[in-house]
Amino acid sequence: MASRSLSYTQLLGLLSFILLLVTTTTMAVRVGVILHKPSAPTLPVFREAPAFRNGDQCGTREADQIHIAMTLDTNYLRGTMAAVLSLLQHSTCPENLSFHFLSLPHFENDLFTSIKSTFPYLNFKIYQFDPNLVRSKISKSIRQALDQPLNYARIYLADIIPSSVDRIIYLDSDLVVVDDIEKLWHVEMEGKVVAAPEYCHANFTHYFTRTFWSDPVLVKVLEGKRPCYFNTGVMVVDVNKWRKGMYTQKVEEWMTIQKQKRIYHLGSLPPFLLIFAGDIKAVNHRWNQHGLGGDNFEGRCRTLHPGPISLLHWSGKGKPWLRLDSRKPCIVDHLWAPYDLYRSSRHSLEE
C-alpha cells in the first residue's frame, strides 16, 4: 500500500508540474506577443547598383551638396530604388547627391540594410516619421494609397531634416529622372517657398467639394489667386522660408477643416493648392511628365505629352513594376524597366 500511495503521490506531483510548466510557457508567449515590436514586412531583394563617381569638375564643399528627400514605403521600395538609380546614372556629380529618406518607426534597420547593400556608396540618412502626427488628421480619399501616413510626410519635411539644410528637392517614389538633377536644384526661386511645374487654367471645381464651394468664408481663400495646379510629387522647397512661414501648421489647419467639413477628395494635394496655388515658382514642364499611372480609379494607360522630358512620373493608380509583373504593361512602362534593380526568383535561379 505504501508503494502504491507513493506512486500515486508522485503521479499527482508530476501532473501538477506539467500543468504549471504549460501555464507558465503560455503566459510567457502571450506577454511576448504583446511586448514585441511590429515585425518589418519581407522586403524585396535588389541587385547591387554600379558605383557612380564624380567628374573632375565637381566640387567637394558642403555647398556643392544636392539634397533630395523621399519616403521609404515598403510597398513602393522597388520604385524608390529605381528612382535613386536614375538620379545617380544621369547626374554629373552623383557623389554630391545627399538623400534624406523618411520611414515609419521599427522598419529603418531593415531599410538601411536594403539601401546600403544596393547602393554601397550612397550618401544617405533615414529619419523616423511618426505616423501619429497625421493619423487623426487624415480623411478618407478616393484611393487608399493616398491615405497612408507616409503620403503626408512631405508636410513635416522641414521639421525633420537638419536645420543646416536650407533647400531640398522632394520626389515621389514612382518616378525616374532622365536628366541631371542639378539643373532642377539650381532653379531661381525668386522669393517663393515652392518651385514646381505649374499648370494654369486648371478647373478647381474638380479638386474641392460642393461643401467647399458653398461656404463663402472658405471660397474667399481662392479669391484673386490664379487657378494653377501643381503636382506635389516633384517640388523644390526653400526650407528656411517654409519654417519661417509656419507652413506645416497652415497645412494642418486645412486638414482639420477637412476632417470637420469634407471639402476635398485628393489626399495631401488640396491643402497645398489652397495655400500655394498661383504663388509658386513655375518650373519647365519637362521636370514632371506626370499622370503616367493613369487615373486614380482604373490606372489606364496614357501616352507621353509632347515636348522634352527630364522626369517621368507614374502618378495615378497604375505602377510600372506591378503592370510589368502582371505582363500587362503600358508602352511607357518600358521606359521605367531599365532602372528596375529588383532581383526576382527567376533572375536568382539564372545566376
Curated annotation (Swiss-Prot):
Keywords annotated in UniProt: Cell wall biogenesis/degradation, Glycoprotein, Glycosyltransferase, Golgi apparatus, Membrane, Signal-anchor, Transferase, Transmembrane, Transmembrane helix
Any one cellular-component term (Gene Ontology): Golgi membrane
Segments in the Cytoplasmic topological domain: 1-8
Side of membrane Lumenal, spans: 30-351
Top class in the EC scheme: transferase
Membrane topology: Single-pass type II membrane protein
Transmembrane segments: 9-29
Record-level GO BP terms: cell wall organization; pectin biosynthetic process
Pfam families: Glyco_transf_8 (PF01501)
Localization: Golgi apparatus membrane
Family: Belongs to the glycosyltransferase 8 family.
Primary role: May be involved in pectin and/or xylans biosynthesis in cell walls.
The protein, known as: Probable galacturonosyltransferase-like 4
Source organism: Arabidopsis thaliana (Mouse-ear cress)
Gene: GATL4
